[in-house]
Amino acid sequence: MRSIFNELADEQGFRRVELSEYHRYRDLHGAALLRELGLPLRKLPRVMNSMRRRMADHRGTLSLFPGIADALHRLAVSGVQLAIVSSNSRENVERFLGRDNAGLIGCYACGVSMFGKASKLRQVLRRSAVQHQYAIYIGDEIRDAEAAKAAGIAFGAVTWGQHSQEALRAQRPAEIFATVADMSDKLS
């Protein structure tokens, strides 16, 4: 993902994310991150669309975090209704998951705008007939926590993704999952 982002940075004139700086960016959110990268908000939709297209082109080089496939199967077998709300396209999400894993997902809401996840979360709850008090939205970004709060559902933070554990802890998640196994153990 970083390499795809850096390709776009070079083409569109904003700052690259070097590996040595990556951990510093994990604590930044929203406007602060865009400001640090020199990426104007007006360019964000175009950059996100380009990211989606490039991710589709690079699908063979992207893979799930170790243990995710097993966790999805374990959760599905235990009766957990799985859904995905993502700003990425459904096609990219399904390709990324692979056919077997994608088949475990009961509801998709993909292609969501960067700041439109809360309404999609509410829509997924209605479509799946899950009451908000029984739902948890698992994510790795501060905006995931904000969307869950706006939708009136619990947020579970995973520490192996976009934002740091400290940044996510500040959002007061219902659960913090340090490992994939920790997530599947607590939820199944």
Show which residues each predicted segment covers:
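Short, acidic loop-to-helix structural element flanking the phosphoryl-transfer center
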Residues: 56-97, 118-119
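N-terminal helical cap/lid subdomain that shapes the substrate entry/recognition surface
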Residues: 1-69, 77
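Short beta->alpha linker loops
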Residues: 25, 66-67, 88-89, 112, ...
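Short phosphate-binding/catalytic loops that engage adenosine nucleotides
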Residues: 39, 78-80, 153, 173
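A short, structured active-site edge motif that brings together acidic residues
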Residues: 20-22, 103-116
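Structural recognition of alpha->loop->beta junctions
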Residues: 100-108, 167-187
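Conserved Lys-Pro-Asp/Glu-containing loop-to-beta segment of HAD-superfamily phosphomonoesterases
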Residues: 118-145
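Acidic, Mg2+-coordinating phosphoryl-transfer loop and its flanking beta/alpha structural elements
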Residues: 136-178
